Amino acid sequence: MHCPFCRHPDSRVVDSRETDEGQAIRRRRSCPECGRRFTTVETAVLAVVKRSGVSEPFSREKVIRGVRRACQGRDVDDDALNVLAQKVEDAVRGLGTPEIPSHEVGLAILGPLRELDEVAYLRFASVYRSFSSAEDFEREIEALRAHRGA
């Protein structure tokens, strides 16, 4: 790694620690040329493969934006959305693959969203699962009632 101060092409790792609940590694480095220290953070890139085949990095912000639309007019605060996005990221990282289909991200959103707000869940599920009739909504509401009773 190049030193950000003198651009020397090498550096020595002084200390390494896990951070962000094990999702990243923070390294303290020292430049052998100028002697200055700097910090780097390394994370494994999780790629989402869209239906078109295009791959893009996983984005918590994108998850939050999509869920926020479903929560419009509901009493759901930003902290709850951030927690939901973290749960979704943990779930998709837990699959253990570097690339995940966008469909799997949608599935990972449904569970935590159902626990957060049932109306927002129905809104999100209706778009995600392409509801086309009132019967689709009725089936999903029955499934919600069964889940609540379990």
Swiss-Prot record:
Zinc finger regions, unnamed: 3-34
Gene that encodes it: nrdR
Necessary cofactors: Zn(2+)
Annotated ranges, domain ATP-cone: 46-136
Pfam families linked: ATP-cone, Zn_ribbon_NrdR
Keyword rRNA-binding: no
Protein name, as recorded: Transcriptional repressor NrdR
Family: Belongs to the NrdR family.
